[in-house]
Amino acid sequence: MFMSKRTHPVMWIACTLSMLSPALQAASPFPALDRPALQARAPERQVMTAAAQAGDRLVAVGERGVVVLSDDGGRTWRQARRVPVSTTLTAVSFVHHMLGWAVGHGGVVLHTHDGGETWEKQADGMALANAASDAAAEAARRHPESQRAAQDLEAAKLLIKDGADKPLLDVQFTDALHGRIVGAYNLFFETNDGGKTWTSGANRLENPKSLHLYAIRSRGSRVYIVGEQGQLHRSVDGGHTFEALPTPYKGSLFSLDLADKGDVVIAGLRGNAFRSVDDGASWVKIDDAPPVSFISVSAFADGGVLLGNQAGQVFLDRPGFALTALSVPPLFPLAGMVLLKDESLLALGAGGVVRVPLELGKSKAPK
């Protein structure tokens, strides 16, 4: 359950989409995609955006390409030895203690084979744009009368014209070979060879306005993607096909997770969060949350989930119990969070990365 948990920094999405890589590169004559990560004196205090568990190790990523590692449950941190980019990293996923991937601004995809100690660049926005263009051109060739194929081809041409300026916002690998990434403007790519090559899957999504895709999760043959304007895309055949499902909220959905009992939980703007027990066919609102955007959902063993918001508040939702605000030390606005094996919380944001004790067993409040 805990091996590959990761979060992405939805609190920073507005910034992510307004301060894309050209802005980051303006401060230096060397592009951020080619400049190594900032070496920080206290790297764990840099703006951190996402984290994952890699076996017993914790790996967190953040702005300027900073990656930090902890081998004592988040009590102490050290910086990764080599990261080839200084662009902001937004999400990270591990499949076991050695193999992991991170994504970020400029469409960058990084890979580690040594538990996060060193990283290599597998792709960037230009490589992904070329892959999208190839896929769209092939679809247009096969279906010359398809309006959708023609639209996809035009969108792919725009990606190439714009260059590597689109952020990736989430990544999930299910094993050493198979992974998916999503991002702004309907970016959706898949790999079957551990990230060596990527194929666009955007034409499988009903997203004609190219709205942003914020988060992706999968379990078995089911894949879920949430995004801007209440988007929810679901696949029941391992990602071969997707259908757009209606959701009760038409604002942005920033996060989702799959609870151990099979429930799907989605959350987003203004404290809106919903739970489904039937794979997204119907939804029940998680009531009593303040009108502050949820930025992270983290599921745990008994069907419960933790929800974190922009105010630095953490809530517990369990089936059959009322939503409960957990008593935690004052936190900075959260960019992401990860529930640890000992049921402590790893909180990430403008204050860096901190370990927060929780008392989940004392937080039950029957409805």
Feature annotation, model-predicted:
Residues 21-23:
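N-terminal signal peptide c-region/cleavage motif recognized by signal peptidases
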Residues 25-367:
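Residue-level hotspots at or immediately adjacent to binding/recognition sites across diverse folds
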Residues 14-17, 142:
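Compositionally biased, low-complexity segments
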Residues 2-13:
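Bacterial N-terminal signal peptides that target proteins for export
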